[in-house]
């Protein structure tokens, strides 16, 4: 692995793979956030029901992903607080992300995509209708002051490439240009994330320090995803922070994204599993047998991760259904021996079946911790130049056996 002392301030590479087709690397964002990494996706404006303090016990540097649609219902309150706090410095902050790196995303990670009316995006939150235009986007960024913010634009799913009409392509590009020009015109400490898409003209857009690959996670195979990502990234310098947002974001999707060179992988999977009563439980290899080529391992990932009923599902043992009655008497087994949570499977089963909110809170913290463990092992294997073998052995160690 090549070593770098790093001359860039925002993102510093620590080591990287030499192969152009698989540009995975270890790095640091803003001298604190170690990559590759996965932020905690907030369904609301706050990481409720978990607190920043608790997340800091899971992640060395709390990293939160906040959605535009979750901020919109609170916009009037945020504006009122901002107005009053200028005259009263003793007011308790309405939203406090102190100590955390924050990423503001346009994608609705738990719902269907928004509709468009003119140049405005239409969201429906709890049966209420909210509109987002470029000026509202600017207002939200000013009030929230996120570390990083993805520029809103129309989403065209790569799984529907054949259906992209010239009108849709033009609409996506025009929307992006409008929002980009508005958001980049004003001074702000927020680093703007620019999407890379076949329909977006990127001329005269300056130096890309952070980029996003939108439109993935909607039914394309992992092999198709690989080919399209390679096509979209062929003109990049390799110095940019790469972000991908996945609609499912399973462990095998995570490993695939890291092999493809992504530094930040946004996945709602830990939270989605928690809502359904599922706990992540997988083995992490400590020894890596063999010497495998990336192409072979990518094909293996493609075979083991399939799209069913609107979501991706890994064909490995990685989750446990704690609502299942088989866990009623399992009082000595934890959700996973590696977990930060020490409650038994029987206790969680009881909480879930009684519809106690604490059951989902415990599951949420457990699942987030399991993903943090996975990413830590990914970072270690990149430093040791064993990532490809780690991915292969992870699959083999967790394969379902009849």
Swiss-Prot record:
Please name the PANTHER family in this protein's record.
QUEUINE TRNA-RIBOSYLTRANSFERASE ACCESSORY SUBUNIT 2
State what protein this is by name: Queuine tRNA-ribosyltransferase-like protein
Per UniProt, the keywords (alphabetical) are: Glycosyltransferase, Transferase
A Pfam family the protein falls into: TGT
Organism for this UniProt entry: Theileria parva
User: Which InterPro entries does the UniProt record give?
Assistant: Queuine_tRNA-ribosyltrfase, TGT-like_sf, tRNA_ribo_trans-like
Write out the GO biological process terms: tRNA-guanine transglycosylation
Name the family: Belongs to the queuine tRNA-ribosyltransferase family.
């Amino acid at each position: 692995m090549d070593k770098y002392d790093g001359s860039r301030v925002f993102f510093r590479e620590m080591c990287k793979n030499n192969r152009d087709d698989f540009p995975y690397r270890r790095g640091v964002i803003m001298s604190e956030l170690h990559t590759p990494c996965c932020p905690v996706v907030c369904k609301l404006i706050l990481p409720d029901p978990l607190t920043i303090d608790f997340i800091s016990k899971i992640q060395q540097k709390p990293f939160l992903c906040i959605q535009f649609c979750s901020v919109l219902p609170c916009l009037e309150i945020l504006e009122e607080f901002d107005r009053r706090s200028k005259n009263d410095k003793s007011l308790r902050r309405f939203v406090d992300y102190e100590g955390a790196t924050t990423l503001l995303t346009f994608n609705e990670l738990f719902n269907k995509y928004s509709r468009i009316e003119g140049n405005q995006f239409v969201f429906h939150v709890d049966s209420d209708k909210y509109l987002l235009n470029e000026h509202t986007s600017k207002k939200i960024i000013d009030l929230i002051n996120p570390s990083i913010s993805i520029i809103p634009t129309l989403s065209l799913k790569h799984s529907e490439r054949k259906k992209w009409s010239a009108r849709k392509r033009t609409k996506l590009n025009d929307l992006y240009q409008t929002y980009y020009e508005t958001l980049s015109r004003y001074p702000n400490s927020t680093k703007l994330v620019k999407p890379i898409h076949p329909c977006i003209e990127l001329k005269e857009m300056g130096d890309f320090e952070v980029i996003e690959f939108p439109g993935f996670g909607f039914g394309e195979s992992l092999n198709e995803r690989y080919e399209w990502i390679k096509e979209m990234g062929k003109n990049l310098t390799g110095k940019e922070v790469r972000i991908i947002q996945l609609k499912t974001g399973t462990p095998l999707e995570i490993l695939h994204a890291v092999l493809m060179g992504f530094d930040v992988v946004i996945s709602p999977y830990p939270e989605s599993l928690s809502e359904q009563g599922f706990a992540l439980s997988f083995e992490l290899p400590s020894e890596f047998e063999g010497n495998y080529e990336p192409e072979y391992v990518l094909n293996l990932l493609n075979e083991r991760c399939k799209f069913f009923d609107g979501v991706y599902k890994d064909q490995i043992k990685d989750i446990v259904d704690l609502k299942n009655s088989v866990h009623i008497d399992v009082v000595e087994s934890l959700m996973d021996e590696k977990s930060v949570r020490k409650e038994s499977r029987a206790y969680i089963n009881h909480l879930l079946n009684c519809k106690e909110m604490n059951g989902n809170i415990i599951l949420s913290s457990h699942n987030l911790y399991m993903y943090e463990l996975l990413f830590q092992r990914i970072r270690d294997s990149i430093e040791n130049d064993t990532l490809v073998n780690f991915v292969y052995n992870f699959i083999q160690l967790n394969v379902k056996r009849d």
